[in-house]
A protein has these predicted regions:
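A structural signal for short, hydrophobic/glycine-enriched beta-strand patches
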Residues: 1-157
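Acidic-residue sensor for enzyme active/binding pockets
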Residues: 66, 87, 161, 169, ...
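A conserved mid-domain beta-alpha-beta active-site/ligand-binding segment of alpha/beta enzyme cores
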Residues: 167-188
């Protein structure tokens, strides 16, 4: 029997195979799991740079920014400081993507392939955002982690808190992209 909400699972939860890329992109957050995965991929030789991004976050007030928090995790996991690019102003996923692209351009890093490391329930919105902001010829690979919420594609529908989180992502996708759909940059 098919569960009627499998289509939501398919929409929200994205994970692809990972191949070598030019950079590992890490949209900011206040949990260590995404930087731990990025460091793991870095050490396995998947990309020469990690670009964590994010500005101030009251949940990690010990740090000036999500970037500083994530950078410290990376360094503690053996990632060389010069392999960690800096973007410490972003306040949301669109700014994570837009300001990341600016950092890459400023550093003259030509991006053809990128690995996006993010929370599992944030993966569709994060991927769509980076795809809209970055040039269309950039190929994205998505590697997800389970954060402290424990929400995954296999359990999001089992309790109200997890369901609310996933449904919130659907609402955010609608808000983020309603104006992008009719006026996207076109691939020729």
């Amino acid at each position: 029997m098919v569960y009627p909400f499998d289509c939501i699972t398919d929409l929200i939860f994205v994970e692809t195979y990972v191949q070598k890329a030019n950079v590992i992109l890490v949209p900011g957050c206040s949990q260590p799991q995404i930087m731990e995965r990025a460091a793991e991929l870095y050490h396995k030789g998947f990309a020469p740079y990690i670009l964590p991004t994010g500005g101030a976050n009251h949940e990690i007030s010990k740090y000036r920014s999500e970037w500083e928090y994530l950078k410290n995790i990376g360094i503690n996991l053996g990632v060389p400081e010069d392999a960690i690019l800096k973007e410490d102003k972003a306040r949301n996923t669109f700014e994570n993507a837009r300001l990341s692209l600016e950092v890459l351009n400023k550093n003259r890093i030509d991006i053809k392939k990128a690995i996006l490391v993010c929370k599992s329930y944030h993966s569709r919105r994060a991927l769509l955002t980076y795809q809209v902001v970055f040039p269309y010829d950039v190929e994205f690979y998505v590697s997800t982690v389970t954060d402290k919420s424990g929400v995954t594609k296999d359990n999001w529908f089992l309790n109200t808190e997890a369901t609310t989180l996933v449904m919130g992502e659907i609402v955010k996708i609608g808000k983020y992209f309603r104006n992008e759909i009719c006026t996207p940059k076109r691939k020729n």
